[in-house]
Amino acid sequence: MTEPSFNTSALIEESIKSAKINVGAKLVLAYSGGVDSEVLAQGLSLYAKSHPEFRYLLVHVHHGLSRNADAWVTHCQKQALDYQLPIEVVQVQVKTGPRLSIEAEARRARYKAITSLMDSADVLLTAHHLDDQLETVLLALKRGLGPKGLSAMGALQVFDGDKQLLRPLLNVSREQIEAKAASLSLPHIEDESNTDDKYDRNFLRLQIIPKLKSRWSAIATTASRSAALCAQQQAVIDDEVSARLPNFIELVPYGEGTALNLDLLSHQTPNWQALLLRGYIESSGFAPVSQIQLEQLLSQLLTAKPDANLEVRIADMLVRRFREKAYLSSYRPHKPKSLESIELTLESEVHFVQEINIPLLSNIRVEVLEDDGGERVRLPLIEEKVSVRFSAVGSLRCHPHNRQKGRELKKLWQEYGVPPWERERVPLIFYNEKLVCAVGYWVEHSFQSAEHETGLRFSIAIVSNECESI
């Protein structure tokens, strides 16, 4: 029988020290009640007794997938009482469907539920162990992943933007954990789905890994070492990509977005083209794309005709090409909603800062300023109604303050490099029926505030989270 040659609370302490956690932070344990999380919960209860400077919480997620799920809740609540640790039970609904992985969807729902109970300073602890790491490496190989995927799981990782995830048992084998539970007579649940090898991890755990271990007993340890080396190499790549990528990114002249300069990208080697595009996608908050998807996307972006307005959808990401630049946005299946004209009621006081909410888009910030070197619109006359509109006819003539002569609106959009899909989202300020300002771009020459004269400045103050649903 395997000896439980580890001290759980000591591993927790070592893990927490490496993370440099602030006093008062909450240590949140993902607690299923299985043998792995049971051992970690028992160790956390011992650690908590000597470390009152932290707060503690066990979180059990009820997935609703097993007829035994209610009994598991009862077990976890009883154990939490014995451990003298607070527990929160969260019930979730797991998406199911012919093209959905129950494993992946359950994991996604579980992490979403747990993170909803965490603040940015809090830390998540999970009971992943050495054999889980081997499974993750094998699955990465099956999927054809590179160094990033083969890095598998780290003992310390950042997730959900700014939260830390710790895996104190990552170098402990399943056999050691089971021996530990037996030595402490710890009760734990057995999830009946763990014996169903139609799930990839179960297939590896039940059919493949035992054979690998019978031939190479240390394979879990050596696979973990390879994962650590891949993580080390990936960190170097990530650092270099982070250093180079800003040279290829441009701020768009509207909103708060960016675009990738394809002309500059085309002068890089194929390997760097792929690394930089992947880095741009992931740094923009989108899920990693496969190697095949990346190669196809690169080919389409870099070989399209100069005047081509390419549009490619990958999962929930929409990639558009316009004037040698690539733009990323979230894909929404619904037809864009129309942005209606809104009449603005400006405050009567001359000196004010006012924000007018534009549903579905943003807030328009209106400032009354004396001469500050910027371009301003003269104050409206009593008989002039002020309104904000969208999608004015392209034949409308405008004379921007920074142009020698007037041109049709559709020509000005081209001159200013505004992509076609953004033109209907630019707020246009009207005095009665006269366009006086394209917010973020220009002030109409004949409505420009004179030097040393008080005027209005319009700007986009806040881009709402609903912006992409338009």
Swiss-Prot record:
GO terms for biological process: tRNA modification. The keyword Nucleotide-binding applies. CDD domains: TilS_N (cd01992). One of its GO terms (molecular function) is ATP binding. The keyword Transport does not apply. Keywords: ATP-binding, Cytoplasm, Ligase, Nucleotide-binding, tRNA processing. GO terms for cellular component: cytoplasm. InterPro entries: Lysidine-tRNA-synth_C, Rossmann-like_a/b/a_fold, TilS/TtcA_N, tRNA_Ile_lys_synt, tRNA_Ile_lys_synt_N, tRNA_Ile_lys_synt_subst-bd. It catalyses: cytidine(34) in tRNA(Ile2) + L-lysine + ATP = lysidine(34) in tRNA(Ile2) + AMP + diphosphate + H(+). It comes from the Bacteria. Its EC number is 6.3.4.19. Its main location: cytoplasm. Coiled coil: none annotated. ATP binds at S32, G33, G34, V35, D36, S37. SUPFAM superfamilies: Adenine nucleotide alpha hydrolases-like, MesJ substrate recognition domain-like, PheT/TilS domain. It is found in: Cytoplasm. PANTHER family: TRNA(ILE)-LYSIDINE SYNTHASE-RELATED. The N-terminal region contains the highly conserved SGGXDS motif, predicted to be a P-loop motif involved in ATP binding. Belongs to the tRNA(Ile)-lysidine synthase family. Ligates lysine onto the cytidine present at position 34 of the AUA codon-specific tRNA(Ile) that contains the anticodon CAU, in an ATP-dependent manner. Cytidine is converted to lysidine, thus changing the amino acid specificity of the tRNA from methionine to isoleucine. This is tRNA(Ile)-lysidine synthase. It comes from Shewanella woodyi (strain ATCC 51908 / MS32). The gene is tilS.
